From Swiss-Prot:
Residues 1255-1267, 1280-1302 have a biased composition (Acidic residues). This is DNA-directed RNA polymerase subunit beta'. Residues 1268-1277 have a biased composition (Low complexity). It comes from Synechococcus sp. (strain JA-3-3Ab). Its EC number is 2.7.7.6.
Amino acid sequence: MSEKGRFSAGLVRQAADGAKAKTPPPPVPFRNYQIGKKELRNLIAWSFARYGTARTAQMADALKALGFKYATQAAVSISIEDLRIPPSKRQLLAQAEAEIEAATERYTRGEITEVERYQKVIDTWNQTNDQIKEEMLSNFRQNDPLNSVYMMANSGARGNVSQVRQLVGMRGLMANPQGEIIDLPIKTNFREGLTVTEYIISSYGARKGLVDTALRTADSGYLTRRLVDVSQDVIVRESDCGTDQGILLEPLMDADKVVVSLEERLVGRVLARDVVHPQTQEILARRNQEVDHDLAKAIVEAGIRQVMVRSPLTCEANRSVCRMCYGWSLAHSRLVDLGEAVGIIAAQSIGEPGTQLTMRTFHTGGVFTGEVARQIRAPFAGVVRFPKNLRTRPFRTRHGDDALQLEANNQIVLEGPDGQREVFDMTQGSTLLVRDGAQVQRDQLIAEVTVAKAVRKSTEKAQKEVVADLAGEIRFADLPIEEKTDRQGNTTCTAQRQGLIWVMSGQVYNLPPGAEPVVKNGDRVQAGDVIAETSLVTEHGGIVRLPERSDTKSGREVEIINAAVVLHEARVRVESHQGREQFLLDTASGQTFVLKATPGTKVGNDEVVAELIENNFRTQTGGLVKFAGVEVARRGKAKQGYEVIRGGTLLWIPEETHEVNKDISLLNVEDGQYVEAGTEVVKDIFCQNAGVVEVIQKNDILREIVIKPGSLHLVDDPADLEIPTGTLIQPGQKLLSSIVPDRLVYLEQVETPEGPGLLLRPVYEYEIPDRPVVPSQESTSESGRSIRLRAVQRVPFKDGERVKSVGPVELLRTQLVLEIDTDAPQLKADIELIQDEKDPSIRRLQLVILETLLLRRDVEADLTQGSTHTRLLVSEGDSIGRGGVIARTEIQAKKAGIVQGIRQGAEVVRRVLVVTDDDLLTVPLTGQASVEVGALVRAGDELAPGIPAPESGQVMQIADGQVVLRLARPYLVSAGAILQVRDGDLVQRGDSLALLVFERAKTGDIIQGLPRIEELLEARKPKEMCVLAKRPGTVQLSWRGEEPDLRVIEADGTVTEYSVMPGQNLIVVDGQPVQVGDPLTDGPANPHDLLEIYFEYHRQTLGDDQAARLALREVQRFLVNEVQNVYRSQGVEIADKHIEIVVRQMTSKVRVDDSGDTVLLPGELVELREIQQTNATMAITGGAPAKYTPVLLGITKASLNTDSFISAASFQETTRVLTEAAIEGKSDWLRGLKENVIIGRLIPAGTGFSTYEEMAPEPEPEEEEEPVVLPELPPRLILDDDQLIDDSTPVDEPTEDEGEEE
């Protein structure tokens, strides 16, 4: 204390020394309390406001020294010993586990659904977690207040309560990557150490945190950029705009909680009206007076709830803000200076905390519902009394307990045994967990009170699967179902109200496809007996062949040969050709074929097996093909060419074609020139034959060069020739007197460099036989299917086709093609090599059509299938007809029991149920049984007086003083659940029984944090908007079944009807008065709708100008408050004025609907102020004013719609902005900061402000401060039409070059 005292005295002395201050500051009060982080902040802020920066810095230094000195003396350190675990933790955990055990028991008895159990578990753990946290704090507070961990967290130096909780309490529940909460909590803390399971679960949460941070930084940066762009041109340009407008400040509330107090909102503002004390009527403060901390406190203490202050939202300064409307600059707690770039400051203040907002809130399955309902626990033991007029309806809580829900506000009373009496107020919708006259213990939960209006939480439909924990038969008990068929014909079954699905235990065998049961319901089977069997049947029949190497993974193969063909005279040999193996086929007639399909592959109908090797139809070069008597048809694939139907002669006129595709300059010969063989026609290309050259070129690119062999005859006049070019000339036919060919030639006229000539081109003839030779073959065929090889001749070219080639060309191919006499075209033949029966060294080619059947491997008892055993019924070489059985697979029972559940009719999943002795339970009785045979009993129900059932089940028989139960499990399904099974179905363990449909609270607002801020500032339509009241009045609410019928009736009797979308919850009640713009259903409001509703409502009474102002004012207030709510909920404090500046930029424009007599265009976006001035002018001249609607622009839209096209273009959509500006001939007046930075001028803010402000004469400033203008440096400004050329370089400064070197 002495140290602190000395310190304060020092401050006073320093203050006294500061003689510059007009009045000596009051002595420093002695602050006698613990100083933590918050008090420290206040202390420094107070000193800063009172004594300025220098002394505050000195004081902060002194505080630092003080802190370190005592920390060192006290030896504050941290060791693992300081992590003291509260002793009551074990007992709290045990208590929670007992509660959960009870809930699980209720679940197994079928009293609550899976969802209710899950909800109960999660809520229990959350409560336990909180209790442990409280215990931890109180443990520290009482037993170890100087614990270093506790001091650190408590003072706010480092860490917070939730982190300390993880160190010494329990870590709590974690969410998995889908955002579902895992119902296994982490019960340990870091001091005790986590188990392996807990460690893995906890790493989920950690990963989520990291990913989130990474995404957040990017989003937050982009938000800041957009904010800077929208508000960069807001600069303080005037001292006082003189407006009498203002906004009403009131404390920002969220339900019953004060989020921002009025006092906090008032500090640093300027009053727009005098403030009068409500009781004494004395004036506390005048208009235009600044509100400091003391005045704010005085105003709040006088009980004033609303204060009219000036605000950037209502400032009338042109394109800027005046000092009075902005208020204090938060940097130094004095009125803001002229030329301050408040827009940029606002943008940074809103953008910077972005990284601290959590991004995605995970749908945590209704964990945060604790915040919505306030729990009432009994302060003492006693009896609960309800009033007579209490209206309630029965209600099932989210934990599956029965409770009562209040239909109207009321009270309940708790009476203690010693005459104590406590009255609890209950609001409508509250839940009572006890009945009238019930005895309650101390701290027992009596009721949960809903907080009115706060229930802005919306709910969403979610589904949860119910899974069978045992195999058996489904039995519905008291479960009415409703079937719906949709347009696609899918049927869904839903439960009409809640009921039970029982699964009666038994062994369920899944039958493989095609298996038929061989037992009947009620048969008794022993282990190993056959329950069902399946047969393996051949489709086509044939001869059985059992390959040796046929044991594959899945079982043994059996092959059945349907048909076969052998080339019994041809032998197969293998040759190595270019490093690859080739199979060659030598026939008896001396032909050699090469196999196109290698042995071991399959070929289908009409596919090529082999091709004849021959050189008779090979040409030297390319050429022209002509058919003489040959007939072809296209069969099979196009690339295989044309099949010859009738033989004849192929005529072949050779020519050599070189594809060049090079520049024409490389050509060495001329078109029509005759060249010798071996001439270099183009660089690096030589011709092989002598002949006439034809050059084909296009766009100076040499495409092709053709050399046509033949004899060239120059003629004087080609007109003498009677035979047309392109004709075939027979030997001895006279052309001209001197030319008589001695062989078949093809006539062509050419233009040579020497003149016209005739080219006689030789023609070669190739004879094609009608039928090719086929090697002999013998076919064996079962089941009447024939298979053979057919020889086919194919020509690859059509008649008259020009074949471009330099090398040889094959004109005819002879191929062997497989032909299956087809009634099953999908069959394929296998190609095999077999040894000759007489000479094993000779191999023959065989083609077989096979059917391969797979025998199952014997399965040793798998859980669901039972054990299978397969028997083969045929042997090698057997001949089998169509549909013959080859093997049988038997499914054997694993345990003895009684067969049940065989259903007639075609079921998709074939299953058989065997009820074994394991599924039965015998309970000895002492007295008369109180149940009858067939009854379904739950665990804990009495079978006889004093004998509870050990398990749930169905009573099978009662005899000889004992009851036989068939084990079963009940599952409770809620109304509306989608059923996945029908009554009597057989299910395996792990099958889905039903999907429970339930509503869960969306955590807080659907989107929180950054995305919500972005949604507000971009003025996006929220996903699930609420319905807003369009006119004030009283709600009239009636229900048609589930559908609400909602009307609002005004004072004059006008009725407005509202339609409520499904999934929206009403937050108004019958008879409630509502104002215009109030929400009627839950969900976030759409700001565009708000604006439209307010504008339309006020327009009828006030006219456009006032209506637009009021509507915009409401939306501005809504946006400012919503943004504040998000930031405050995350613990971030931002001054209202920053948000107001941004919101002002968003709400400054209107859209012209009808231009009247003005020069505006319909649809144009104009500043509200501009259009009001224009309309005022019209009113004077008597023209028709423009009609308009106010619009709300998101920050991106607003940035792109600024006056300055340079600023807009540098933000986004550069091309569009610049082209539009160019078309409209816009000029940029360089008013904002960004434009000037881009062009490289001095920015008109800070010291540069006065440089530009000289143009407009300012009214004399009323402040006593000296003006900031430096008079001796007047800027030289030339105003030239619409250009603004400015060189504000004073004369006596260094020239540019020197200046840049500095």
